[in-house]
């Protein structure tokens, strides 16, 4: 059987088999209509009660409209890029990029790919699978969907669990803050841009997952105040855990960009810093380099 970018590996399902009494393998074999040879790659459409309907549209290397039916009956819509070099023999990194309001599912299939974050990621880590979910909103259900999609990808592909990255822009930043208030241990590093913090800080700080917060000083949607407040609350929570100031500075970074940052990059002084930041931060090598370091 040929190995393709859309192939899930028997190796990647081995842990699931041990935990689920081989039900995932039964689904896999049934889907291909034959026996499974040890170590052979299989074109799995079902895995552990999940059913994937692969998308038919593509955009700059992404399959745009994948739909994953969960055991609970929800459908998770997402775009996925798997590098041509991926064959499952070596674990790859994973990056989950959550878009803002303009990328939610009701905005239309593929609207999430208006942002640059998914497209620049492989410039920093070549051996990385990139997913961009199309969520329903920026609240708790969408945060649960991000966690579930992350966990499914970890089981469906050969992924290095120590190299899983997360970002959220605008409303997506609100969503990932809730994710970090529930399952922060899934992620190595997190980028939170032009947004505010809605998640549980104690859960985040217990896990010590590094977070970078970037926003314009005069962000015209949120303002920079909520990000500043969250930053101070996170630092205070780490101090309460008796971490050193040096260690705290490694775990949380606040980057408030002055107006000069935007004007030096071609935006008018009175341009909206929310939209400008959403564009510029994805192409800022210092910001993106921090995430993927």
Regions of interest found by a model, annotated:
Residues 85-90, 138-170:
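Gly/Ser-rich "nucleophile elbow"/oxyanion-hole loop immediately N-terminal to the catalytic nucleophile
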């Amino acid at each position: 059987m040929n190995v393709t970018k859309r192939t899930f590996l028997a190796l990647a399902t081995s842990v699931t088999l041990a935990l689920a009494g081989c039900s995932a393998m039964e689904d896999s074999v049934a889907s291909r209509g034959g026996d499974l040879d040890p170590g052979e790659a299989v074109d799995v459409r079902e895995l552990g009660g999940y059913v994937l309907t692969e998308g038919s549209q593509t955009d700059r290397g992404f399959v745009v409209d994948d739909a994953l039916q969960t055991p609970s009956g929800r459908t998770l819509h997402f775009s996925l890029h798997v590098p041509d070099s991926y064959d499952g023999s070596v674990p790859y990194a994973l990056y989950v990029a959550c878009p803002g309001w303009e990328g939610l599912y009701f905005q239309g299939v593929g609207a999430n790919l208006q942002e640059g974050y998914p497209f620049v990621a492989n410039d920093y880590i070549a051996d990385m699978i990139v997913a961009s979910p199309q969520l329903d909103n920026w609240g708790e259900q969408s945060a649960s969907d991000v966690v579930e999609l992350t966990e499914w990808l970890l089981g469906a592909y050969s992924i290095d669990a120590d190299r899983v990255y997360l970002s959220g822009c605008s409303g997506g930043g609100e969503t990932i803050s809730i994710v970090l208030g529930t399952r922060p241990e899934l992620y190595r590093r997190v980028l939170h841009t032009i947004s505010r913090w809605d998640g549980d800080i104690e859960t985040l700080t217990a896990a010590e997952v590094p977070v970078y917060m970037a926003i314009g000083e005069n962000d015209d949607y949120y303002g920079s105040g909520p990000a500043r407040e969250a930053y101070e609350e996170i630092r205070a929570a780490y101090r309460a855990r008796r971490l050193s100031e040096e260690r705290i500075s490694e775990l949380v970074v606040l980057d408030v960009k002055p107006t000069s940052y935007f004007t030096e990059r071609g935006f008018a002084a009175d341009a909206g810093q929310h939209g400008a930041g959403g564009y510029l931060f994805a192409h800022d090598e210092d910001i993106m380099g921090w995430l993927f370091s």
